[in-house]
Amino acid sequence: MVPASGSASANAFYSPGVDNGDYVYISGQGPRRPDGSLPGSFSAQVSQTLDNVKTIVEAAGLTMEHVVYTQVYLEDIGKYDEMNSIFGEYFPKAPPARAVLGVARAPQSSIEISAVAVRSLADRRSIYPPNYQHSDSCSPGVLTHDRMFVSSMSGSDPSTGKVPDDPAAQVDLALDRLQAVLKAAGLEMGNMVFVNPYLTSEMPAHVM
């Protein structure tokens, strides 16, 4: 699927989006404008990246409200707050589930975003566990007619934001937070079919 306008273009190895009927899968989009130029500021790059995602979503006949999951890659994780404030502007009604990852290098510039959109909004709902601090930019989970999308869950204490020194305690906290989202949707850990753990060098794989 290729939008009629925008910076996304297909080649032998890449499609901007794939429409399989119930879902539209949007490939990682960078911040280049349709003419190939790159915005100068980071905030402008975030906006252009989301505009590029939006162009593909709309080419499928959908809106940003149909987006249920996004994955954001940042070269400088220190710019998270700046990205986050702009991100929320694109999802004013029902923000998607989301993972934000710090990476050593993105292909085009400092940010890349991939996404999944659902075609029917009939059964789409955001999932919030009890006492969860609401966010304007993402939902802990999004439930559709046939699957659940869960945001990345960090190994920090949800009430204080503190990250334990013990790696095993971080794993427990992340899994507890994941379980709380599933439970709020009426699901259990046994219902999960895919999980993607992200570790830093400070987290031994055998502990996770």
Regions found by a protein language model. Name each.
Residues M1-D51, T55-Y69, L74-F194, L199-M208:
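N-terminal presequence-like segments and the immediate start of the first folded domain
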